[in-house]
Amino acid sequence: MAVWIQAQQLQGDALHQMQALYGQHFPIEVRHYLSQWIESQAWDSIDLDNPQENIKATQLLEGLVQELQKKAEHQVGEDGFLLKIKLGHYATQLQNTYDRCPMELVRCIRHILYNEQRLVREANNGTSPAGSLADAMSQKHLQINQTFEELRPVTQDTENELKKLQQTQEYFIIQYQESLRIQAQFAQLAQLNPQERLSRETALQQKQVTLEAWLQREAQTLQQYRVELAEKHQKTLQLLRKQQTIILDDELIQWKRRQQLAGNGGPPEGSLDVLQSWCEKLAEIIWQNRQQIRRAEHLCQQLPIPGPVEEMLAEVNATITDIISALVTSTFIIEKQPPQVLKTQTKFAATVRLLVGGKLNVHMNPPQVKATIISEQRAKSLLKNESTRNDCSGEILNNCCVMEYHQATGTLSAHFRNMSLKRIKRSDRRGAESVTEEKFTILFESQFSVGGNELVFQVKTLSLPVVVIVHGSQDNNATATVLWDNAFAEPGRVPFAVPDKVLWPQLCEALNMKFKAEVQSNRGLTKENLVFLAQKLFNSSSSHLEDYSGMSVSWSQFNRENLPGRNYTFWQWFDGVMEVLKKHLKPHWNDGAILGFVNKQQAHDLLINKPDGTFLLRFSDSEIGGITIAWKFDSQERMFWNLMPFTTRDFSIRSLADRLGDLNYLIYVFPDRPKDEVYSKYYTPVPCEPATAKAVDGYVKPQIKQVVPEFVSASSDSAGGNATYMDQAPSPAVCPQAHYSIYPQNPDPVLDNDGDFDLDDTMDVARRVEELLGRPMDSQWIPHAQS
């Protein structure tokens, strides 16, 4: 029988556990409508630790989305209309969530299927053997759920004991009242005659002695019941505190760490639904125990009996108040972080959420949340509970928001949608620290009333550190500060301390994560790429990655000190590489057509045994965000040629594929792939109209063509003398032609004696020509101008 069919038959807590597996990360409706397809896929065959399996994971994601879309299309009728919209929405949601990290979808569904199978097995035979899909996370989640299973009967047991104590005490009070009535009867005996008084007095004395003895024994019994109940509550609170520590200090902190790494491009932090279900169970059990303790205290006040129980109850009451206080304050979290590079006068958003809002009825009196930006120093003072002035470091517009309770999802949250940092007040900088190294944080504050104003909590939570910029040119260095902080922040740190030095392998992991996210590619940094980066950073010639494994990288090396002989830092160079790949070269990087991380000498070594016309693309050492072509062409002058680097500006005018297509003497993409086979699908289609075709205004439209003057004869031959092309080279010179005489000729060659360009000596005239092409052109620029 299909697992889903059996899962739908679960009852009680098993059903709740199954429902808690689903949420925004994977809606239960998707599981229901695609149950057969989901269970027929080989989720378990994918190795989550093998990056090469990403292709399989992507295929499964695409298949899931396609199945959802097909299911949506087949919905008809009035009832089917809403379902069609909902399933279509889920298809888009899953695509957006897992497109960059399909492995997380596999991990998610494996976790769901494993737990469904476990719950079904437990329901069928009461056993829970470890299945093939069991992992450390599942085992820990199982342990948490088992602890809840222990807490429920324990809490019910103390409830029963409390009722027993209450009944016993009520009967004791009745008997105590009887004792008082007997004493009153003694006072009335004086009115009787001696014989009758003696008879009645003897009977009353005997009754009083018996009752006093019973009351004395029963008082001891009551005291014993009270002590036993208090001891049971002490044990329950120990178990509750341990469970709360696991959930808040382990699971929630891990979620926050995943959220922090997601800021560096790591996988999404995942849904809060499971965490919320645990926190709500905690809140429910804690509140039940607190009410029991309060009732026990009331019983003691109602009938005081000397002994240790008052002190014990006061202690457990204080303990459970501390526990519930920690739960409420710790579960006030930032679900959606504000941007960590925050530009003034720019709209930004954030979302805060209280994971126990529904269970503790906080939403009955919706609280308001206020956001302020504070300095690192004030953040330190807040965490130390030091009294500080309400001193903010700037002004945020639209910084107040009322929390809303969403009945369907059971979430209590506040969505700040239109905040804007109007101004910022900076602190005095330390030493060489720049403004882009100064960290701030957004402080979210509120006040929650729990249990009908029985308890009132002042709650605060801090965002991840933010770096404030006033101009886009600061974004690069601000991102470096955020990357370093997110990657290397240690648990429980003082805000916002990070190590000044880290091991090179740690930085490699952070760079690779950021690279894949920024370039939006599954092709990350290889071992060879990391060796190249290490050589650049450490100014070393070693080609063995192991030689760098014990070396440390300081923050100054990363983004404060310039690389040797350059006017930029290591990070600025690396960020430039990501920028040009992301904006213009992503498909070529994904195709493996860009080698990228090699220096000039390495490029020559790779090309030396290749046929003429073999070329490779490498990132420029001399220009940030530049990429250059190195190729082999054995001539009388030299064997290796290096073209002046192209940048984002160049590719916004003419694409890399078209530029390579123009250079017919570039034949093979290293190592031996035909150029057209690799790049032809990216060429801009050539219009079918003849060259003499006229535009609406009567002019022939010019076209840009990539030319290297040293190879101009080859280019001219291949162009077939087509006069509608304007030759363009990424160089200080333009190929001489009479009707392009608006600029003076530059006699210097395009390539220097080493086959390289000197970027600082001359002006790139061709780029100015390209700029002019976007403006109204003088008739002298138009070949065959029409009158």
Curated annotation (Swiss-Prot):
Primary localization class, coarse: cytoplasm
| UniProt keyword Glycoprotein, yes or no | no
Post-translational note: Tyrosine phosphorylated in response to signaling via activated KIT, resulting in translocation to the nucleus. Tyrosine phosphorylated in response to signaling via activated FLT3; wild-type FLT3 results in much weaker phosphorylation than constitutively activated mutant FLT3. Alternatively, can be phosphorylated by JAK2. Phosphorylation at Tyr-699 by PTK6 or HCK leads to an increase of its transcriptional activity.
GO cellular component, alphabetical, reads: cytoplasm; cytosol; nucleus; RNA polymerase II transcription regulator complex
Residues modified as Phosphotyrosine are: 90, 682, 699
Boundaries of every SH2 domain copy: 589-686
GO MF entries: chromatin binding; DNA binding; DNA-binding transcription activator activity, RNA polymerase II-specific; DNA-binding transcription factor activity, RNA polymerase II-specific; protein dimerization activity; protein homodimerization activity; RNA polymerase II cis-regulatory region sequence-specific DNA binding
Recorded superkingdom? Eukaryota
Name the UniProt key words of this record, in alphabetical order. Activator, Cytoplasm, DNA-binding, Nucleus, Phosphoprotein, SH2 domain, Transcription, Transcription regulation
GO BP of this protein: cell surface receptor signaling pathway via JAK-STAT; cellular response to epidermal growth factor stimulus; cellular response to growth factor stimulus; cytokine-mediated signaling pathway; defense response; development of secondary female sexual characteristics; development of secondary male sexual characteristics; female pregnancy
Q: PROSITE patterns, alphabetically?
A: SH2
Localization terms from the record: Cytoplasm; Nucleus
Role: Carries out a dual function: signal transduction and activation of transcription. Mediates cellular responses to the cytokine KITLG/SCF and other growth factors. Binds to the GAS element and activates PRL-induced transcription. Positively regulates hematopoietic/erythroid differentiation.
Q: How does it assemble?
A: Upon activation, forms a homodimer or a heterodimer with a related family member. Binds NR3C1. Interacts with NCOA1. Interacts with NMI. Interacts with SOCS7. Interacts (via SH2 domain) with INSR. Interacts with CPEB3; this inhibits STAT5B-mediated transcriptional activation.
Q: Which family does it belong to?
A: Belongs to the transcription factor STAT family.
| Protein name (Swiss-Prot/TrEMBL) | Signal transducer and activator of transcription 5B
Q: Which gene encodes it?
A: STAT5B
